[in-house]
């Protein structure tokens, strides 16, 4: 019956009356004695809780009685065993019921909250007779009320049951007694039944122990007479003993009977078609299974075959049964032969062999799982199906092999019935696959061989799949790297995949047969810090491919890092720079590294990227956020965060040429990387300018397979250049370009002294350079010309990464300026000695004894150089400022008017100024030589006699300080030819000249005529090459005047008294003016315009003289 529920008032109370006792071993004890024994426990509290002791086990159903009460004997009946199993407190039932009620109420409230109730219920138009409002009678509201009512009724019924149980539990003591009585009755009934069973078994066993009484009489008769007279004689005669020949005839007769029977009558199953009749028996042989010997017992053709012997043809095979088991097998086979014939016999033995083979394979698999394959196999035998799971510890999908017996049901299109056979079912990585290639020998059973064959096929499939995926990569599909797979069907340890990582490193991929873990071993060893990522959800093929890819790329990067460090390449940490390099590279690359070099500009670095599709070198352009004057790029601590501007791949492999990678090759590689970086920086600069055409574009500039750096073809046309890059060229150079419009910019190595990249610009002139080659300066190596052609080359130096486009445009325009100047000088019959881009040296004079050099200087606006190419091209200011200069030797007389001539050179246009200077050199040469003679002062201790002020190359003021006499010497045009005009420059009111000097000058010069000069009353005109004679005559006048003043008897003449007097001057040093006046014109015809009589011209010269500075030279 169900468990008894007790009220809390009886918890711990005893359910026996005052006279109850506890039986123990046939003895009974009073209740008081038990209470006295358990007195210690009774003091602490109730001994029983709902009839169960506090320290008793829950599995005990009968209360244990202390053993020390066994000696006590009572006269009453024995105490019944007390049943306490299944009792529980009534309070627990109440608590659980209350809790369940609360939970159901919460669910009811939630359910009602989800019900939608229409707030506007349907109200009748008339009020009910009771006068009460019916309320909301909508269907939703009615359903809520019904749910509340149903819940209330259900819970009320439950609590009524609890009330009934509460009342009944108060009488639980009587019910407990009834339970004990019922248990006692059942125990007695079971004991009675057991006694009857024991008596029956004993009676049955005694039958075998019965022994018949000995028949001594019969035994005596047999022993004495040798026979028993009471037994009847049937008249049988013992057969004659067979001889050897007779035995042979009998066996041959049996053989004939068996052979004829098998041929004519019996139905032989197909597996028994191969048989052999011998020795009075027939032997049926089933290859790989068994040999069965049968024979006949009668000549009757309908008699059955009988079992003789059986031999198994596979190994290992169980031993031939002996004794009782062999008898059982013989009886079974004979029964089958009698009922089903040979076909039934074959089916029996065939299934027996198949089952036996499965059991043998199961035992072998179990031994493997316990020994060498421990933790790698899981073996189960389900009926006649062997399941072997391998690689049990490998995460992901599982693989196993099932070996079972396939039923040989007849196929619909087959006439012969099928035979049961051992079949395999292979589940590889969660999917069933064909298993025809599994190596299985039915004669020699070996579970390890089968398992190794299955694992070898699995490994081969994995490695071949990985081979196909890796083969799809460009590096392996093109044959740049080798990939070979060694696969076998029998031995998994021989399956491996050989992968060439780099030129010198190889990787061997294999799979451990017992655990299924892929093993990657590289030679030489490669760092495995990038081979730590494992995804258990990824398949083995994907895992191998991804690991091979990571290791290959890591090996390639390690190799390139180790090789280029000796070239001075310094690796960079992109994390320190906070550069997101991955966003500018293709998504398929796996590893990369950045390098900088001390020879490169700080805004360029190179990157080496590696992927399964190839290894590449990239040039990366950065835009630093700090000023240009900063530390070199490897030291990133003091930098602002650089900005990635562009990246361009420049090679398709780390080593483009498949040669021996030696030190020389690495040096060439470093040379090529520096060169491509220099070329890329110039191409990027031209691309940003957008106004100068060039070819090829930056994305097509790559290092050639022979490590040759490509060139850039730049279209040079001054007319299309942005105005900021133009230079004020000579007039002829503006009209006609002297350089053809295609310039080839090439990289020619690194200058070891300057630590700069050498960029060479190749171009062609419009005219031949045959006359220019001998004139090129030997010390200037920045410009060379082609002998016998029109080609030229310019050498430009800049750190790799710094564009030379600005310098190229500057030098090309400088070259055009030089060529224009050379053409002008040659047209003026000036002999050129040497020239370069910065100076032109030439000789002049009638005897070609005077040398001079023209200097060409181009200044840059450094503030504009800091702008980006785009901003620079949009500016209207000029980046270059052209200024020409002329320089003479210390012995050249023209050194005194060097600055004046330089000022004439820089007038616009430049060519006009140059022609003017060449004419001025011819014009002023006699004058300069005459002044040198007048200034000859070997002792350098004489007083200042003559002071010459150079207003410009054609205007001079002669001042004799001692005589306060001033003269102006001007080049002018007289009768359509150039002459020198000397006239008095003293003001009429401020003249302090001695009348004798004035008279002497008038008499000697103004009204006289000499060699190459002639007086004009107010001045003197002299030929250009005879002006020295005029100056010497002038000097003689002052020398004579000084001599007269030194003689005390000297008296001024009347002629001298009527004129302004002159002091006795000393010859002064020559004063030279720097620069020119506004009145001096570039055109010679404009400068030499009037004769000395023109006072307006004199006034203009005096006005110009007041605006000029004077430089004193000894």
From Swiss-Prot:
<dbReference type="GO" id="GO:0006357">
    <property type="term" value="P:regulation of transcription by RNA polymerase II"/>
</dbReference>
<protein>
    <recommendedName>
        <fullName>Mediator of RNA polymerase II transcription subunit 14</fullName>
    </recommendedName>
</protein>
<feature type="region of interest" description="Disordered">
    <location>
        <begin position="1"/>
        <end position="27"/>
    </location>
</feature>
<comment type="function">
    <text>Component of the Mediator complex, a coactivator involved in the regulated transcription of nearly all RNA polymerase II-dependent genes. Mediator functions as a bridge to convey information from gene-specific regulatory proteins to the basal RNA polymerase II transcription machinery. Mediator is recruited to promoters by direct interactions with regulatory proteins and serves as a scaffold for the assembly of a functional preinitiation complex with RNA polymerase II and the general transcription factors.</text>
</comment>
<dbReference type="InterPro" id="IPR013947">
    <property type="entry name" value="Mediator_Med14"/>
</dbReference>
<keyword id="KW-0805">Transcription regulation</keyword>
<keyword id="KW-0539">Nucleus</keyword>
<keyword id="KW-0804">Transcription</keyword>
<feature type="region of interest" description="Disordered">
    <location>
        <begin position="40"/>
        <end position="79"/>
    </location>
</feature>
<dbReference type="GO" id="GO:0070847">
    <property type="term" value="C:core mediator complex"/>
</dbReference>
<comment type="subunit">
    <text>Component of the Mediator complex.</text>
</comment>
<dbReference type="InterPro" id="IPR055122">
    <property type="entry name" value="Med14_N"/>
</dbReference>
<dbReference type="GO" id="GO:0003712">
    <property type="term" value="F:transcription coregulator activity"/>
</dbReference>
<feature type="compositionally biased region" description="Polar residues">
    <location>
        <begin position="126"/>
        <end position="140"/>
    </location>
</feature>
<dbReference type="Pfam" id="PF08638">
    <property type="entry name" value="Med14"/>
</dbReference>
<dbReference type="GO" id="GO:0016592">
    <property type="term" value="C:mediator complex"/>
</dbReference>
<keyword id="KW-0010">Activator</keyword>
<comment type="similarity">
    <text>Belongs to the Mediator complex subunit 14 family.</text>
</comment>
<feature type="region of interest" description="Disordered">
    <location>
        <begin position="120"/>
        <end position="141"/>
    </location>
</feature>
């Amino acid at each position: 019956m169900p468990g008894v529920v007790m009220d809390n008032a009886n918890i711990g109370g005893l359910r026996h009356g005052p006279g109850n006792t506890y039986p123990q071993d046939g003895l009974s004890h009073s209740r008081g004695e038990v209470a006295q024994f358990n007195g210690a426990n009774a003091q602490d509290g109730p001994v029983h809780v709902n009839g169960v002791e506090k320290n008793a086990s829950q599995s005990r159903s009968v209360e244990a009685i202390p053993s020390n009460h066994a000696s006590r004997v009572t006269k009453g009946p024995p105490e019944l065993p007390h049943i306490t199993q299944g009792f529980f407190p009534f309070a627990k039932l109440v608590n659980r019921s209350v809790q369940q009620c609360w939970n159901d109420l919460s669910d009811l409230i939630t359910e009602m909250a989800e019900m939608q109730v229409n707030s506007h219920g349907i109200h009748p138009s008339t009020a009910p007779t009771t006068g009460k409002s019916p309320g909301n009678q909508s269907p939703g509201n009615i359903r809520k009320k019904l749910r509340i009512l149903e819940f209330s009724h259900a819970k009320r019924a439950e609590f009524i049951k609890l009330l009934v149980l509460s009342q009944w539990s108060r009488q639980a003591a009587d019910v407990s007694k009834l339970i004990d009585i019922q248990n006692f009755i059942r125990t007695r009934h079971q004991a009675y039944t057991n006694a009857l069973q024991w008596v029956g078994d004993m009676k049955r066993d005694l039958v075998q122990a019965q022994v018949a009484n000995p028949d001594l009489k019969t035994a005596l008769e047999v022993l004495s007479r040798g026979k028993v007279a009471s037994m009847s004689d049937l008249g049988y005669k013992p057969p004659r003993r067979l001889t050897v020949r007779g035995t042979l005839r009998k066996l041959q007769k049996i053989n004939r009977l068996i052979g004829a029977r098998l041929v004519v009558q019996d139905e032989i199953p197909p597996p028994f078609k191969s048989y052999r009749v011998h020795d009075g028996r027939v032997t049926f042989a089933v290859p790989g299974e068994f040999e069965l010997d049968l024979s006949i017992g009668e000549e009757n053709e309908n008699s059955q075959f009988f079992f003789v012997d059986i031999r198994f043809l596979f190994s290992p095979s169980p031993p031939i049964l002996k004794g009782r088991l062999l008898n059982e097998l013989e009886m079974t086979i004979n029964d089958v032969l009698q009922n089903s014939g040979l076909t039934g016999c074959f089916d029996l033995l065939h299934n027996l062999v198949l089952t036996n083979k499965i059991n043998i394979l199961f035992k072998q698999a179990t031994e493997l799982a316990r020994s060498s394959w421990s933790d790698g196999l899981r073996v189960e035998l389900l009926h006649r199906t062997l399941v072997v799971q391998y690689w049990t510890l490998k995460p992901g999908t599982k693989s196993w092999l099932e070996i079972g017996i396939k039923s040989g049901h007849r196929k619909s299109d087959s006439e012969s019935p099928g035979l049961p056979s051992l079949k395999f079912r292979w589940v590889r990585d969660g999917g069933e696959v064909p298993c025809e290639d599994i190596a299985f020998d039915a004669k020699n059973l070996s579970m390890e061989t089968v398992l190794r064959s299955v694992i070898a096929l699995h490994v081969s499939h994995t490695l071949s799949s990985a081979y196909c995926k890796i083969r799809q990569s460009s590096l392996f599909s093109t044959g740049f790297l080798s990939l070979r797979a060694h696969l076998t069907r029998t031995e998994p340890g021989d399956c491996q995949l050989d992968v060439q990582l780099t030129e010198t490193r190889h990787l061997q991929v294999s799979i451990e047969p017992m655990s299924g873990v892929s093993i990657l071993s590289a030679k030489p060893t490669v760092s495995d810090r990038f081979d730590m990522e494992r995804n258990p959800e990824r398949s083995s093929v994907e895992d191998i491919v991804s690991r091979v890819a990571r290791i290959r790329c890591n090996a390639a990067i390690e190799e390139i890092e180790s090789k280029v460090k000796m070239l001075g390449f310094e690796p960079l940490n992109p994390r320190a720079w906070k550069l997101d390099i991955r966003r500018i590279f293709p998504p398929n690359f796996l590893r990369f590294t950045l390098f900088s070099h001390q020879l490169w500009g700080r805004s360029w670095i190179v990157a080496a990227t590696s992927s399964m599709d190839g290894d590449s070198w990239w040039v990366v352009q950065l835009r630093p956020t700090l000023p240009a004057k900063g530390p070199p790029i490897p030291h990133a601590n003091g930098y602002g965060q650089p900005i990635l501007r562009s990246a361009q791949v420049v090679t398709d492999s780390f080593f483009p040429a498949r040669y021996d990678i030696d030190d020389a090759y690495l040096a060439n590689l470093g040379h090529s990387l520096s060169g491509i970086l220099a070329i890329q920086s110039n191409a990027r600069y031209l691309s940003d300018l957008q106004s100068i055409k060039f070819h090829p574009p930056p994305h097509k500039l790559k290092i050639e397979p022979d490590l040759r750096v490509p060139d850039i073809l730049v279209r040079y046309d001054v007319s299309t250049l942005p105005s900021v890059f133009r230079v004020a060229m000579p007039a002829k150079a503006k009209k006609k370009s002297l350089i053809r419009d295609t310039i080839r910019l090439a990289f020619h190595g690194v200058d070891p002294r300057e630590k700069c990249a050498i960029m060479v610009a190749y171009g062609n002139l419009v005219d031949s350079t045959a006359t220019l080659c001998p004139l090129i300066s030997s010390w200037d190596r920045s410009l060379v010309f082609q002998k016998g052609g029109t080609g030229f080359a310019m050498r430009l130096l800049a750190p790799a990464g710094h564009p030379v486009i600005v310098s190229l445009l500057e030098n090309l325009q400088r070259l055009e300026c030089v060529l224009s100047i050379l053409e002008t000088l040659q047209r003026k019959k000036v002999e050129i000695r040497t020239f370069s881009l910065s100076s032109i040296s030439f000789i002049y004079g009638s005897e070609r004894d005077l040398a001079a050099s023209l200097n060409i200087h181009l200044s840059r606006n450094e503030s504009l150089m800091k702008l980006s190419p785009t901003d620079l091209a949009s500016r209207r200011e000029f980046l270059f400022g052209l200024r020409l200069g002329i320089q003479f030797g210390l012995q050249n007389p023209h050194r005194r008017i060097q600055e004046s001539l330089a000022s004439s050179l820089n007038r616009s246009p430049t060519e006009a100024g140059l022609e003017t200077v060449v004419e001025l050199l011819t014009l002023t040469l006699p004058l300069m030589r005459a002044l040198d003679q007048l200034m000859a002062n070997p002792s350098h201790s004489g007083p200042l006699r003559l002071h010459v002020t150079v207003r410009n190359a054609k205007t001079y003021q002669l001042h004799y300080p001692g005589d306060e006499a001033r003269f102006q010497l001007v080049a002018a045009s007289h009768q359509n030819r150039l002459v020198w005009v000397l006239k008095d420059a003293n003001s009429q009111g401020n003249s302090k000249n001695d009348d004798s000097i004035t008279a002497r000058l008038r008499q000697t010069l103004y009204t006289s005529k000499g060699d190459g000069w002639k007086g004009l009353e107010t001045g003197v005109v002299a030929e250009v090459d005879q002006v020295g004679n005029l100056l010497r005559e002038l000097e003689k006048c002052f020398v004579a005047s000084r001599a007269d003043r030194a003689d005390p008897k000297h008296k001024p003449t009347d002629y001298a008294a009527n004129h302004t007097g002159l002091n006795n001057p000393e010859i002064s040093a020559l004063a030279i003016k720097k620069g020119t006046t506004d009145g001096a014109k570039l055109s010679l015809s404009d400068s030499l315009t009037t004769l000395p009589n023109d006072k307006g011209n004199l006034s203009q010269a005096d006005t110009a003289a007041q605006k000029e500075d004077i430089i004193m030279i000894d």
